[in-house]
Amino acid sequence: MRWLPLLALIVSPLASAVTLDELQQRFTGQPVVRAHFEQVRTIKDMPQPLRSQGEMLIARDSGLLWDQKAPFPMTLLLDDMRMVQAINGQPPQTVTADNNPQMFQFNHLLRALFQADRRVLEENFRIDFKDLGAGRWSLVLTPKTTPLDKIFATLDLGGATYLETIRLNDKQGDRTDIALSRHQLTPASLTDDERQRFAAP
């Protein structure tokens, strides 16, 4: 699933995640979040996992930007109107609700998911939220609607002050682990360069 990085891209700090409602308040209360990511994809029957890393940005009013640096350059931009992916200098590919409605609906749902929108979570997942103590928490989501239930067995999130780990367990027995670090909340608005990247055709 080359669109799996989308699952990593809505990230906000959590001061003390005790309830799901608190998660929602924290996730929606940060205008811009930047972080470093490291992703490990473990594929059944492959001897070595696939590793990648880079930088991500989520802007509440603009969308998300996934900027992979290694092992090859890849950018993924998602806003309310389109999803644009460019790999290693190749011409970008654009997905909209018109040319791929199911994929766009899937990605739009993921954006709402990682804002911890309780209504969306309850409509689409069975929820297992736990306060682990010492400021740490876990959230296990089991899909119950299509297309998520056709792709994933569970989505496991964890963290403390910030969302730190994401594990995607898919129906084929493969696993994707994403570690997020170096979170930055400032500047609280997009820089000129970031704004131009979201505005690019």
Task: Describe these PLM feature segments.
Residues 1-4:
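Positively charged n-region of N-terminal signal peptides that target proteins for export
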Residues 11-16:
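N-terminal signal peptide c-region/cleavage motif recognized by signal peptidases
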Residues 18-43, 49, 87-143:
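Flexible, processing/modification-adjacent segments and terminal tails
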Residues 37, 64-68, 83-86, 139-141, ...:
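Short hydrophobic/aromatic-rich beta-strand segments that constitute the beta-sheet cores
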Residues 44, 72-74, 147-148, 187:
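Short beta-strands and strand-coil junctions in structured, solvent-facing domains, enriched
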Residues 48-55:
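Amphipathic hydrophobic-ligand
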Residues 55-108, 176:
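An acidic-aromatic
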Residues 118-201:
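Gly/Pro-enriched, hydrophobic low-complexity segments
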